[in-house]
Amino acid sequence: MRMILKGNPASLGTATGFVKVVRSDEDMQNLKQGEILVAEMTSPDYVAAMSRAAAIVTERGGRTCHAAIVSRELGVPCIVGAVGAIEILGRVCGVVTVRVEVTGGEVFENS
């Protein structure tokens, strides 16, 4: 496995799945159970999609942002403040699975 992204731990855990970059309401509705939700930030509109995600990675935010708080409530692993997440993880979207290891705030590409 190769580390491809690093951010800040927000909700501990580990998950593996395909990436789904979420930019619109349609993307949220199409997020499948077990996918890795990747977004700039989340809002209350994202909660249903967040509950289906295996893990959440956001480009912005800190330990008290929406993604961090809701992911802890849902028990979903979450990394926030992962600058460049949409661009970097967008490259592997639907192609290979990634492993999110929140303890170190790291995302790895599975080979």
Label the model's feature ranges:
Residues 2-35, 40-111:
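Acidic, glycine-rich flexible loop/linker segments
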